[in-house]
Amino acid sequence: MATLGVNIDHIANVRQARKTVEPDPVQFAFLAELGGADSITVHLREDRRHIQDRDVFLLKETIKTKLNLEMAATKEMLEIAKKILPDYVTLVPEKREEVTTEGGLDLKSNVQYLKKAVGSLKDSNIEVSAFIDPLSEQINYSKEIGFDFIELHTGKYAELSGSNQHKELQRIIESTHIANDLGLVVNAGHGLNYNNVRKIASINNMNELNIGHSIVARALAIGLEKSVREMKSLITLN
């Protein structure tokens, strides 16, 4: 049964729109946990457009579940991660002009550098995940580089409909099986919402789904704790 990681970046987006102190994403992480979140995910971007260093340090000290730190594999971020010591790090691609992460890491072109980055994090007892597109080549490189987890990018699945969405779902299912056979733990995320999450959650051996925007959007209408509870019930429905 898949677990739920709640991404709270969008809470920080609202705060940073006014460069003020509220809403505090640390407080909302507490509410997400009350709603049943199994982990809290934040993306500390190089430009600090939403989550700030202070948020990540406080989350590490206060949350009761696990902390998943998304970040680019830069020297600065590696040093920060080794100070914070999150439960795990998810390495993601990052472009300054993008609104949100647009695709998975290209592992093939960065094998040697990523081996060093992953090794450095593991030396600090941090488990490491790669955010990748559901492609067998990327999965094989994930294993070669030494990642513990992969997070499959579900953005294309979320954008499609009908038979095209079904084809993408099959690709995600096949990718999950390939990764499991290699000993990799599989997470998934990006674009998942209350309408499309069930089929991803029901994939055999899917470990965790990381979801943010749709939960926060629904929370504006019904409150964060309740919106997390509703998403958790969809993921864990037998």
Swiss-Prot record:
Site (Transition state stabilizer): E151
Active site: H43, E70, H190
Reaction(s) the record says it catalyses: 3-amino-2-oxopropyl phosphate + 1-deoxy-D-xylulose 5-phosphate = pyridoxine 5'-phosphate + phosphate + 2 H2O + H(+)
GO biological process, one term: pyridoxine biosynthetic process
Keyword Transferase carried by entry: yes
UniProt xrefs under InterPro entries: Aldolase_TIM, PyrdxlP_synth_PdxJ, Pyridoxine-5'_phos_synth
This protein's pathway: Cofactor biosynthesis; pyridoxine 5'-phosphate biosynthesis; pyridoxine 5'-phosphate from D-erythrose 4-phosphate: step 5/5
Record localization: Cytoplasm
SUPFAM superfamilies in alphabetical order: Pyridoxine 5'-phosphate synthase
This enzyme's EC code(s): 2.6.99.2
Similarity field: Belongs to the PNP synthase family.
Complexes and interactors: Homooctamer; tetramer of dimers.
Name the record gives this protein: Pyridoxine 5'-phosphate synthase
The species this protein was found in: Prochlorococcus marinus (strain AS9601)
Gene name for this UniProt entry: pdxJ
